[in-house]
Amino acid sequence: EMPDAKGAMKFSGTPADCVKMGIRFLKEKGVQIDMVFSGINHGGNLGTDTLYSGTVAAAMEGVICGIPGVAVSVDSHRPSHFETACKLTLDVFEKVKAGIPDGVCLSINVPNLPAEEIKGLKYASLGMRQYIEQFEQTINQQGQTEYWYRGLPVIYNCDEMSNDVTAMQQHYATITPLKFDLTHEQFMQELCKWELKI
């Protein structure tokens, strides 16, 4: 049970698989699905993070199923200002309800700050999110060695580039429209000249 919800289901699996199952079960019950919201995630999904993100994958699964998808993240693994992301998410909900094009997945990233400390909102392209590599070695309960990734984001010169990563560094919230087609169209013609055979 969830407060103020007409109904709720709980699934165990990857975020995208859970969305896939949720959509299936709801459709079987005759429920019209208006949109898929994923999050609010602990930790930003900026730039190249989107390639690894379960939060973005869950929202994208909605898009693949023909349903608008929105991923929401707070740029901290220990967020303390969900209320800031909640307010923006409610505003986005109203815009998505009014309609967005097919195939669009929105990725929202919000600084872990009170609303009054956020400089504003930027509609931003994806940037390069690189990390200073750090791995923590631990021993699990079975006595096996495990490694936990603890990389720290590289800080970029915000004067040289403008994207979601640098906007977050400057304490802006960001919205980025995504699509699932990762094809490098510019290289496709060159690739066809390889004339490979199998």
Describe these PLM feature segments.
Residues 1-25:
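A cross-family phosphate/adenosyl-ligand binding-site feature
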Residues 34-35:
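Structural motif
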Residues 44-53:
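Glycine/threonine-rich flexible loop motifs
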Residues 63-85:
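Glycine-rich phosphate/pyrophosphate-binding loops
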Residues 38-41, 72-73, 108-111, 176:
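Short beta-strand segments
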Residues 14-15, 41-44, 113, 180:
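Short glycine-rich anion-binding loops that position phosphate/pyrophosphate groups of nucleotides
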Residues 22-29, 57-68:
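Alpha-helix C-terminal capping segments
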Residues 84-198:
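Electrostatically charged, flexible surface regions
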